[in-house]
């Protein structure tokens, strides 16, 4: 008579390694509960817009994000906020400049606090930029998937505030004995409010500008091995960051990537026309 097969003992995963609430609430179909609809928060500063970026970004979320969600534009008003019940505007003027600090990082702390005040019962949100354009379908699985870009290269003496913050953040990670992976991929990321505010408070992010994504993910995901992004091999992003990119690669991205994004230099007429035709046809 065959003996009974013993079940393997349950493995208790420490809470610190269980991942985010969003990950724990995902089922195999990418559906999420109970924190639904998912907030998609896009900070917007009108004076830095170069064209219709925000319209394209919103159109991408509406067409391709296959989850119940609600878009929040925080910052300056844009006509796109009046185009449906699935989008809300929170007015939040840019804070005054602080000498020696990189203002977008300080300003985002201010803006995200405003969003938290408006949605106190929501556990977290997706942070996205107005220059990230979804061109193929995705769910929370792709947003939560651990990914990194090239190693942080910063310069404490740079005239560029972003480069100074990269250096300062890397030094802080080393001081705290954290990994120095660069999680800033110019792709949407999911933050849990409580954990994000712990980072804000610990590092005084309202007054000291840091690359918060790297403090956050190197703290709470320090035992993860994120995938290195590669234009040739991943299906996630095509970044347009030069004035004269290979447009054949950009055209292919509408088929083989989930997002297209751009920098200031990469906002060129060819890209603008491609996105306009993709989302709105001849309009």
How does the language model describe each region?
Residues 165-258:
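Catalytic core and acceptor-binding pocket of nucleotide-sugar-dependent glycosyltransferases
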Residues 13, 19-52:
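N-proximal low-complexity "stem/linker" segments adjacent to membrane-targeting elements
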């Amino acid at each position: 008579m065959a003996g009974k097969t013993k079940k393997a003992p349950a493995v208790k995963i420490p809470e610190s390694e269980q991942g985010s609430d969003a990950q724990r609430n995902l089922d195999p179909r990418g559906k999420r509960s109970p924190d639904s609809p998912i907030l998609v928060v896009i900070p917007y500063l009108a004076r830095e817009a170069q064209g219709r970026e925000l319209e394209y970004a919103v159109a991408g979320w509406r067409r391709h994000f296959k989850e119940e969600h609600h878009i929040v534009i925080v910052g300056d008003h844009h006509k796109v906020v009046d185009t449906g019940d699935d989008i809300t505007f929170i007015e939040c003027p840019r804070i005054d400049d602080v000498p020696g600090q990189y203002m977008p990082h300080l300003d985002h702390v201010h803006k995200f606090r405003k969003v938290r005040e408006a949605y106190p019962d929501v556990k977290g949100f997706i942070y996205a930029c107005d220059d990230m354009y979804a061109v193929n379908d995705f769910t929370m699985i792709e947003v939560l998937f651990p990914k990194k870009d090239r190693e942080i290269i910063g310069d404490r003496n740079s005239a560029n505030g972003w480069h100074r913050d990269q250096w300062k953040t890397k030094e802080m990670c080393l001081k705290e004995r954290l990994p120095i992976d660069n999680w800033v991929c110019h792709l949407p990321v999911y933050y849990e409010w409580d954990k994000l505010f712990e980072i804000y408070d610990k590092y005084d992010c309202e007054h000291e500008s840091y690359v918060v994504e790297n403090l956050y993910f190197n703290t709470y995901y320090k035992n993860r091995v994120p995938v290195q992004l590669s234009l040739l091999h991943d299906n996630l992003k095509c970044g347009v960051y030069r004035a004269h990119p290979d447009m054949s690669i950009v055209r292919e991205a509408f088929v083989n990537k989930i997002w297209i994004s751009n920098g200031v230099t990469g906002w060129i007429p060819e890209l603008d026309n491609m996105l306009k035709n993709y989302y709105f046809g001849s309009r």
